[in-house]
């Protein structure tokens, strides 16, 4: 889980050595060995897709519900499943584009917009009264950053954000994207 070139650490509890895994799930979020977000994004898209599928017949394909009600359910259920834990994600632009593609596909489907209608994404978002995914990610990160900045000194999230726990060497080559860098980009 570090960027060091050394092997993974060995952890022993009561004379039992724990196995080192490539990835694990903690609080419904996937943590990988290389700290990339690809598997987490795939899992979030999968969860949001299953939520959307379960609600399709009753909500999104129901002609008796207003568009406002459908979009409220979409934001409350599907976007919540999609963006769960996104406050601490360090996503690259290709991953943001993947999330935005999923979001726009669902918005245009809920609004019953066909590709032959020649409606732009901005117009579809305006009709749905929902922001683009980049804005949603930025809002969540900034809200979390404000929460962390108000924490007392010595709290682990605050120390991590302000690089007060950094020790060791970094790997050669381009450094991985950090949450601090993403937060600076947002402000």
Go through each PLM region and give its residues.
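Short linear motifs embedded in intrinsically disordered, charge-biased segments
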Residues: 1-187
């Amino acid at each position: 889980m570090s960027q060091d070139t050394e092997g993974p650490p060995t952890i022993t509890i009561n004379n039992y050595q724990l196995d080192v895994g490539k990835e694990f799930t903690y609080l419904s979020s996937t943590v990988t060995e290389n700290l990339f977000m690809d598997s987490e994004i795939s899992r979030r898209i999968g969860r949001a897709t299953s939520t959307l599928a379960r609600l399709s017949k009753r909500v999104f394909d129901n002609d008796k519900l207003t568009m406002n009600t459908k979009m409220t359910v979409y934001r409350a259920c599907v976007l919540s499943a999609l963006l769960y834990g996104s406050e601490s994600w360090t996503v690259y632009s290709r991953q943001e584009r993947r999330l935005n593609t999923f979001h726009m596909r669902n918005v245009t489907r809920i609004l019953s917009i066909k590709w032959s209608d020649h409606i732009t994404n901005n117009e579809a978002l305006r009709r749905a009264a929902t922001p683009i995914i980049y804005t949603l990610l930025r809002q969540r990160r900034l809200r979390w950053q404000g929460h962390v900045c108000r924490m007392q000194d010595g709290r682990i999230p605050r120390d991590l954000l302000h690089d007060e726990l950094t020790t060791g060497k970094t790997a050669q080559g381009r450094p991985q994207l950090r949450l601090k860098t993403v937060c600076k980009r947002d402000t």
